């Protein structure tokens, strides 16, 4: 029988039972170009309003995985598991830059397919492109070599990996259907499965700087990713983490790379960044069979940080992908620096009781360090550093942050935006945990 995309879309629209074979045929049509952009848009909107049952989410994920190349690491003679992490994105979230090297130093192999920032969230690829010469789009053969030799490679999605997802996402982005939990789930997991990942630690953000607008929706997304990932044959766990303030005390591409280097070398390890990084990396080690339990995993992770093995893995990856061989030893020589810097003075004395993390991210976008739309050119040097945290006591005139900008005018605009993102009160706020819950 001839497959008609419009009949399949009608079933999704009407919440009729879906044949998993029809899901696969629809995705095959997307890849081949037989399904039009209008039909993709209609499908995405139908899913947005109705969502998909678990069986159809799994089928959609597997079909998107199979729309292109699927990396098979069995012939690469790796002596450890292939594991990965993924975050729904936030502000000051540089965990990928430290978790990948830590896990690689513990014996894991991490082919991390990452994305660019859009809106208020920072993108891992944008951070890495602040490193001169770093190639975020190597060939599949180069990706294999770097993962085998360095233990990790943090790169972008190639044209050969999950091409159907790329086409569907492009339509979602312009049809107000990005927020569909079913489509988010399939998009994330199809790329991870195409990369040949055996176990995935998922970081789902909650709070003012999170991608999902509510804690309930964040939890729903985490549950969906865990159920679909495991249903598709990839061991998956999700951690709900706090994004009511920047995760690290900085935001901006080159600034975050420097923060990651400081973390790996021990120059500075901010507590919130350390808590989330250790939680996710420990999950990767235990799911991959590299540690007996969370306590054993944390002991191993601490050891590779203190010995310098994790920093060495990061340096090896950077050099293998075209970056400076001495980046870890001399970051100030290679990373771009903004021309202007300005402190953000607190308007009054008191306790920091609320931070609008989304506003901080948008301040970086306003400086030129993020994208208002796809295709925007970035200034990798700009951003924020020394961000004050929730619950801190500040005096009037005390710096809440430092703005790094291309000129004095843009620094002044960002200074006002950052100051407005902080609410200072008379009483200290209730303390909140950075790791809210784990879903397995």
Curated annotation (Swiss-Prot):
State the GO CC annotations: cytosol
**Root EC class:** transferase
Q: Is Glycosyltransferase there in the keyword field?
A: yes
Which InterPro entries does the protein's record reference?
A: Glycosyl_Trfase_fam3, Glycosyl_Trfase_fam3_N_dom, Glycosyl_Trfase_fam3_N_dom_sf, Nuc_phospho_transferase, PYNP-like_C_sf, PYNP_C, Pyrmidine_PPas_bac/euk, Pyrmidine_PPase_CS
How this chain assembles, per its entry, is:
Homodimer.
Record function comment: The enzymes which catalyze the reversible phosphorolysis of pyrimidine nucleosides are involved in the degradation of these compounds and in their utilization as carbon and energy sources, or in the rescue of pyrimidine bases for nucleotide synthesis.
Full protein name: Thymidine phosphorylase
Q: Provide the taxonomic classification.
A: Bacteria, Pseudomonadati, Pseudomonadota, Betaproteobacteria, Burkholderiales
């Amino acid at each position: 029988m001839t497959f008609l995309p419009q009949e399949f879309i009608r079933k999704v629209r009407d919440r009729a039972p879906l044949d998993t074979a029809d899901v696969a045929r629809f995705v095959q049509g997307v890849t081949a170009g037989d399904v039009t952009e209008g039909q993709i848009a209609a499908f995405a909107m139908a899913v947005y309003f109705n969502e998909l049952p678990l069986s159809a989410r799994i089928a959609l994920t597997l079909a998107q995985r199979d729309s292109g190349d699927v990396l098979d690491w069995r012939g690469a003679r790796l002596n450890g598991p292939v594991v990965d992490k993924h975050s729904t994105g936030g502000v000051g979230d540089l965990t990928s830059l430290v978790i990948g090297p830590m896990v690689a130093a513990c014996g894991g192999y991490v082919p991390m397919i990452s994305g660019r920032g859009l809106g208020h969230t920072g993108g891992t690829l944008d951070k890495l492109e602040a490193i001169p010469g770093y190639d975020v789009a190597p060939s599949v053969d180069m990706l294999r070599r770097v993962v085998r030799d360095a233990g990790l490679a943090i790169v972008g999605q190639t044209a050969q990996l999950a091409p159907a997802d790329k086409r569907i996402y492009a339509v979602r982005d312009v049809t107000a259907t990005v927020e569909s939990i079913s489509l988010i789930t399939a998009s994330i997991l199809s790329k991870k499965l195409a990369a040949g990942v055996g176990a995935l630690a998922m970081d789902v953000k909650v709070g003012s700087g999170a991608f999902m607008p509510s804690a309930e929706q964040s939890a729903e997304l985490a549950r969906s990713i865990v159920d679909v990932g495991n249903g598709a044959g990839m061991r998956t766990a999700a951690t709900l983490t706090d994004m009511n303030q920047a995760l690290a005390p900085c935001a901006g591409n080159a600034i975050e790379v420097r923060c990651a280097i400081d973390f790996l070398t021990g120059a500075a390890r901010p507590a919130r960044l350390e808590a989330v990084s250790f939680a996710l990396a420990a999950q990767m080690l235990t799911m991959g069979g590299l540690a007996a339990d969370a306590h054993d995993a944390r002991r191993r992770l601490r050891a590779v940080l203190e010995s310098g093995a994790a920093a060495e893995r990061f340096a090896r990856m950077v050099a293998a992908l075209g970056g400076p061989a001495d980046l870890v030893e001399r970051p100030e020589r290679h990373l771009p620096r903004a021309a202007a810097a300005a402190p953000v003075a607190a308007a009054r004395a008191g306790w920091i009781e609320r931070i609008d993390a989304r506003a901080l991210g948008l301040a970086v976008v306003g400086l030129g360090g993020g994208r208002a739309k796809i295709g925007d050119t970035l200034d990798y040097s700009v951003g924020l550093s020394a961000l004050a945290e929730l619950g801190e006591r500040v005096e009037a005139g005390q710096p809440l942050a430092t703005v790094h900008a291309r000129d004095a005018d843009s620094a002044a605009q960002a200074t006002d935006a950052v100051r407005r993102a902080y609410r200072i009160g008379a009483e200290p706020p209730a303390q909140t945990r950075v790791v809210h819950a784990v879903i397995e």
